[in-house]
Each structure stands twice: as C-alpha cells, then as structure tokens.
A protein has these predicted regions:
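Hydrophobic mid-bilayer segments of alpha-helices in multi-pass membrane transport proteins
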Residues: 71-72, 96-98, 165-172, 185-196, ...
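Loop-to-helix transition at the N-terminal end of transmembrane alpha-helices
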Residues: 36-56, 262-263
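Helix-loop-helix junctions within the multi-pass membrane cores of secondary transporters/permeases
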Residues: 2-30, 50, 59, 64, ...
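Short, amphipathic, aromatic/basic-enriched membrane-interface segments that mark the entry/exit
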Residues: 13-16, 34-42, 59-66, 152-163, ...
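Inter-helical loop and helix-membrane interface segments of multi-pass membrane transporters/permeases
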Residues: 34-38, 79-88, 114-121, 133-175, ...
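Structural signal for alpha-helical transmembrane segments and their membrane-water exit/capping regions
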Residues: 97-106, 137-142, 181-182, 196-208
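Membrane-water interface regions at transmembrane-helix termini and the short interhelical loops
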Residues: 101-118, 141-150, 169-184, 323-324, ...
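Helix-loop-helix hairpins and the membrane-proximal interhelical loops
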Residues: 1-42, 155-156, 186-261
Length: 352
C-alpha cells in the first residue's frame, strides 16, 4: 500500500511539472495563431482538448508522451505561410488535416519503424542534447538573459531588468528546491515567482479570469486551398517531415525503438480529426523526454498514470484562458519552465 501511494504521489508531481510547461506552450501557440485572425479563446480551447486526447492516445500501452502543438512549427506556419504567402488559416487547417491523415496511414506501414531503428545511439543522445540546448536558449532569449547585438553574436542582459532578475531568481530557486529532493520543485518555484511578480505589478489578474470554453466556433471551418492545389504539395510534404522529425527526436530517447511508430500513428490520427474542430497538428513534446526511463504504472484503461493525471490537469485548465494569457504577458514563469525542462533534458542526455 505504501509503494502504491508513493507511485501515485510521484505520478502527480510529474504531472504538475509537465502541465506547468504544457499549459504555457499552448498559450504561446494560441497567441501566435491569434495573429492570423483566429480567435485566441477558441484556439486555446481546441488546443487543450486536442492535447488531452492526443496525450492519452500517444501514451496508451507505453510510456507517458505529452502531445502539444509545436511552437517552432506553428511559428513557421504563421509567419512564413499564412502571413507572408497569404494562405488563410482555414486553408492551412485543411492542409494540416490531409497531412495528418496521410501521416497516420504512412506510419502504420511495416517500413515505418526503419527510420527510428536507423538512428545510432550517438544520434539519439545528440537529439536529446540538442532539444535541451534549444529550450535553454529559448528561455534565455525570452527572459532577456541573452540579448541580440549588432556588434557581437550575442550579449548578456543585466539583473537591473526585472524580467531577467525574476527569471534568474526563479531558476536558482528551482535548482535549490530540486537539490533538497523536493519533487514539486518546479511548480512551487513557478508559483512563488508568479506570486512575487503579481505583487510587484508586472502582471495583473484579469477581472474575468475564467471563460466558458469555446469549442464550437471553429468546428468544420477548414477548407482546401482555393488556388492551384499542386502549389500546396511542397508545403504539405514539408509539414509532414517536420511533424515526423520533431516527434522522432523525442521518441529516439526511448530505449524501446520498436514501439516508436505506434504512438506516432495514433497521434497523427488524433491530429487529423482534431483539425475538424479547428486544432492545428500535434507533436510529441520535448518535455516527454525529461521523464524517468523506468517502467510506469498503468491504469485500468492502459494509459500511464502520469499521462492520465496530466490530461486531467490540462482539462481543468480549459476555462482558464484569460488568466494564463495574463501570466504570459510577463514571461518570467514561462522562461523558468523552459529552462528547468532544458536542464532536465541536459542531465538526461549526459546520462545516456
């Protein structure tokens, strides 16, 4: 009984860590999509719902895999394809739906596992280390710890900047709590910094912090490209490769490569149907690779307990779009989450 309680407590703490990053990632991608004319509240709601279903589907019968829209892929689609090329977001949803369904078919063939088996151990380690450095660099840029410079490659920020100060303090606080073997180090550190920055007035709690989820306004709005359909083929193939490569980079960190294509096939299927309600494609998030490699406890439905708790916590955040959007206005807390997960991945990569 004691071991069962410890497993449940460990799963709950891991779920808090994962959801802390996942929720802010969804807010970031929803803000990006809102720049194309897509309503933020609707994009947030359908992304949460798609992430919940995708996480359960990808994790079924295996390890915990968190499914999220990729900030890198969404940024490319928003700035390069929708804004620069003039493709409407409805057409992009249609392309994403076709690409996801094609990916679901291709990843169910017998040759799909060859890609992951072909990756040597050094490449797997390099992918994990690359993901960790990417997250650390993103956190440093968002927190203005590193600044672009016209004279040198980059330059450091100063602690006189409140964003840099609170982010750096939060990272040190999380490291100290983690060194004290406190499992909830990341959520606790993020909560303390969020409270301090709110008390200092760097962000405000909205007058209406909760909002009824808008899950129907984007339903069945996707369309196929209205111009020459052949011109969309390079975009579709590039999107398919990007989705596969980003997910494979996380799956490559797993020791069991034979199971790598099954969660990817299920995730593509979920993404294809999620496009019908207005959600953009999902990938297996890099935070999934930060989890321990030991065998997880599965629930009665065959879903790992950590994945199930993460999905429930994400579902609880469904009406919290205004509150999370306000928190992201001063990105100290998101930067702490990204930096902490990046450090976890760095340690994981060095131990591989």
């Amino acid at each position: 009984m004691t071991g069962e309680k410890n497993n449940a407590r460990t799963a709950l703490f891991s779920a808090f860590v994962l959801v802390s990053v996942a929720a802010l990632t969804i807010v970031l991608t929803s803000v990006l999509l809102s720049r194309t004319g897509l309503p933020f509240a609707a994009a947030y709601a359908v992304s949460i719902l798609a992430a919940v279903i995708g996480t359960c589907a990808a994790s079924y019968g295996g390890k915990t895999l968190i499914a999220l829209p990729s900030p890198a892929i969404i940024s490319w689609l928003v700035y390069e394809e929708i804004i620069a090329r003039g493709i409407t977001w409805q057409e992009m949803l249609g392309i994403a739906a076709l690409v996801s369904l094609l990916g679901a078919v291709l990843t169910r063939t017998r040759y799909a596992a060859a890609l992951q088996r072909a990756l040597p151990a050094t490449v797997r380690t390099g992918l994990v280390l690359g993901l960790s450095l990417t997250l650390l660099m993103t956190a440093a840029l968002h927190a203005r710890i590193l600044l672009p410079s016209p004279w040198v490659l980059t330059m450091g920020g100063t602690l006189s900047d409140p964003l840099t100060y609170f982010t750096f303090t939060g990272i040190l606080l999380v490291l100290v709590l983690w060194a004290r073997k406190l499992r909830c180090a990341l959520p606790l550190g993020m909560a303390l910094i969020a409270l301090l920055t709110w008390a200092e007035g760097f962000w405000e709690i909205p007058a209406a912090p909760f909002l009824a989820p808008d899950l129907i306004s984007l339903s069945l709005v996707l369309t196929l490209p209205q111009s020459d359909f052949l011109l969309s083929l390079p975009l579709g193939m590039t999107l398919l490769l990007a989705l596969v490569i980003e997910s494979e980079a996380v799956l490559a960190a797993q020791t069991d490569a034979a199971k790598g294509t099954r969660p990817l096939a299920r995730l593509f299927t979920v993404s294809g149907f999620a496009a019908l309600i207005g959600a953009f494609p999902l990938t297996i998030a890099p935070i999934s690779a930060a989890l321990p490699t030991e065998k997880e406890t599965h629930g009665s439905a065959g879903i790992p307990r950590t994945a199930l708790l993460s999905a429930l916590l994400l579902l609880a955040l469904l009406p919290c779009a205004p509150l999370l959007a306000a928190l992201a206005d001063f990105p100290a807390v998101p930067a702490i989450a990204l930096a902490s997960i990046g450090l976890m991945l760095l340690v994981r990569g060095l131990e591989m």
